[in-house]
Amino acid sequence: MIGMLRGHVESVDAVSAIIEVGGVGYEVRMPSADLASMHAGQEIKVYTSLNVSQDAITLFGFGTLASKRMFLQLQKVSGIGPKVALSLLSTLPPDRLARAVADGDATALAKAPGLGKKGAQKIILELKGSIDLSQIEGSSATASTPEDTGAEQVVEGLMSLGWHQQDAAHAVQTVCADNQIETPLNAKDVPRVLKLALTSLDRGR
């Protein structure tokens, strides 16, 4: 079992990153917020979970242990596989996800692509009361080292305007790459990236 990787980011796209460890490149699927804060050459530590199915062997990665724990917890719900669990963590950070379960907020959970209202209600029914909030809350830092608080600010700004976290994080990553804006973002770049990301999202409607 591969439980953790420490190495350098070789490349990153909208759904996964290649992390080079000792000359071997591992393809790791990760939540959107983690991917948005990563860049080639960056040294990072990623907590991982290996999923083996009939069709593929997939390595999932997370910037925090809390995020990994939530990923595993979600899969205890019947009918919830790793793809939907990752979709949930790309829509809501682990602390907000745990709070939504605790509060019975099916509407917040149902925003995750591939889930739906019935699936959200099932998660609440099966997990409510079983998640230790003290281990989750306040633990939404991404895999970035140092943390890319600038990118997080942009993503939060886009979410306040009604965009899903997954779409917002992808837009931030894309506009930074397309416009050669270095990450972690400097404070002075935040307004520009927010404007570019918003334009990109509006164009894609």
Curated annotation (Swiss-Prot):
Intracellular or extracellular location(s): Cytoplasm
Renumbered residue ranges of the record's region Flexible linker: 143-145
Region of interest (Domain III), residue spans: 146-205
Principal location listed in the UniProt entry: cytoplasm
Pfam families with a match to the protein in the record: HHH_5 (PF14520), RuvA_C (PF07499), RuvA_N (PF01330)
InterPro entries, sorted: DNA_helicase_Holl-junc_RuvA_I (IPR013849), Hlx-hairpin-Hlx_DNA-bd_motif (IPR003583), NA-bd_OB-fold (IPR012340), RuvA (IPR000085), RuvA_2-like (IPR010994), RuvA_C (IPR011114), RuvA_C_sf (IPR036267)
Gene3D superfamilies xref list: 5' to 3' exonuclease, C-terminal subdomain (1.10.150.20), DNA helicase RuvA subunit, C-terminal domain (1.10.8.10), Nucleic acid-binding proteins (2.40.50.140)
Gene for this chain: ruvA
Protein name: Holliday junction branch migration complex subunit RuvA
NCBIfam families the UniProt entry points to: ruvA (TIGR00084)
Its biological purpose: The RuvA-RuvB-RuvC complex processes Holliday junction (HJ) DNA during genetic recombination and DNA repair, while the RuvA-RuvB complex plays an important role in the rescue of blocked DNA replication forks via replication fork reversal (RFR). RuvA specifically binds to HJ cruciform DNA, conferring on it an open structure. The RuvB hexamer acts as an ATP-dependent pump, pulling dsDNA into and through the RuvAB complex. HJ branch migration allows RuvC to scan DNA until it finds its consensus sequence, where it cleaves and resolves the cruciform DNA.
UniProt similarity note: Belongs to the RuvA family.
SUPFAM superfamilies xrefs: DNA helicase RuvA subunit, C-terminal domain, Nucleic acid-binding proteins, RuvA domain 2-like
Region (Domain II): 64-142
HAMAP family per the UniProt record, alphabetical: DNA_HJ_migration_RuvA (MF_00031)
Free-text comment on this protein's domains from its UniProt entry: Has three domains with a flexible linker between the domains II and III and assumes an 'L' shape. Domain III is highly mobile and contacts RuvB.
Subunit architecture: Homotetramer. Forms an RuvA(8)-RuvB(12)-Holliday junction (HJ) complex. HJ DNA is sandwiched between 2 RuvA tetramers; dsDNA enters through RuvA and exits via RuvB. An RuvB hexamer assembles on each DNA strand where it exits the tetramer. Each RuvB hexamer is contacted by two RuvA subunits (via domain III) on 2 adjacent RuvB subunits; this complex drives branch migration. In the full resolvosome a probable DNA-RuvA(4)-RuvB(12)-RuvC(2) complex forms which resolves the HJ.
GO BP annotation list: DNA recombination; DNA repair
Gene Ontology cellular component list: cytoplasm; Holliday junction helicase complex; Holliday junction resolvase complex
A Gene Ontology molecular function term of the record: ATP binding
Stretch list, region Domain I: 1-63
UniProt keyword list: Cytoplasm, DNA damage, DNA recombination, DNA repair, DNA-binding
